């Protein structure tokens, strides 16, 4: 299939323009989390994307969803509502980290990179864990219940940077505290709500493109059960399981 071909070519040529060194031992991938916010206030659903800084070593100038590396302290942040049980169960498969950590990372990174708040207003008596001071100062609490786990992807071996990324989707109207516009920052610029068709025309990492396809499937067939894909690569090519 076209997708198989695309994912296999990713393995041979690194997207960030860095030469793939075959002989070196592979780094263990670092846990990461990404949030795809979906708005449905127009005829076509739109997703929030931004352009990575050109100075980034990893995927410069590519359009991506907000997200980043899991900080172990993220799991300690307080939540208004926890993940739904079925979402939590899927995140536990072949994973040692507490599921809420991924959701909290996705929410923290979205806040840091776009200024948008997936949460509720509530005064918290306790001190915030590192990385959550600003949330705490604004009397905000993350809300995990709107997040749906839609996929997981591990960067191919022999890369200078490797991630084991969990992708979440959330309905903007339910998840966001208000309708403020996203604000460009150091990590992401040209932040915009784009239709899936327009998003596909942007310069995207192939895993981002793959997950946009998953979003399209979920939005087109809301009543069906959608099992999150788990993409990973080996020397013989890539494998896609469904969790």
Task: Report the location of each language-model feature.
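N-terminal leader/linker segments that precede catalytic domains of diphosphate-processing enzymes
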Residues: 2-243
């Amino acid at each position: 299939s076209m997708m198989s071909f695309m994912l296999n070519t990713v393995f041979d040529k690194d997207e960030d323009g860095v030469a793939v060194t075959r002989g070196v031992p592979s780094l263990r991938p670092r846990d990461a989390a990404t949030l795809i916010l979906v708005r449905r206030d127009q005829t076509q659903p739109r997703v929030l994307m931004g352009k990575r800084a050109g100075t980034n070593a990893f995927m410069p100038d590519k359009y991506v969803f907000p997200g980043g590396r899991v900080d172990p302290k993220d799991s300690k942040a307080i939540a208004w509502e926890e993940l739904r049980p079925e979402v939590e169960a899927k995140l536990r498969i072949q994973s040692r980290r507490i599921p809420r950590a991924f959701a909290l990372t996705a929410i923290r990174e979205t806040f840091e990179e776009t200024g948008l708040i997936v949460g509720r207003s509530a005064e918290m008596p306790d001190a915030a864990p590192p990385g959550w001071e600003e949330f705490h100062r604004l009397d905000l609490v993350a809300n995990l219940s709107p997040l749906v786990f839609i996929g997981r992807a591990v960067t191919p071996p022999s890369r200078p940077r490797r991630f084991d990324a969990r992708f979440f989707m959330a309905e903007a109207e339910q998840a966001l505290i208000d309708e403020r516009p996203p604000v460009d920052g150091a990590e992401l610029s040209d932040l915009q709500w784009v239709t899936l068709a327009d998003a596909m025309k942007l310069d995207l990492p192939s895993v981002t493109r793959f997950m946009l396809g998953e979003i399209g499937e979920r939005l087109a067939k809301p009543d069906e059960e959608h099992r999150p894909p788990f993409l990973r690569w080996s020397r013989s090519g890539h494998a896609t399981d469904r969790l």
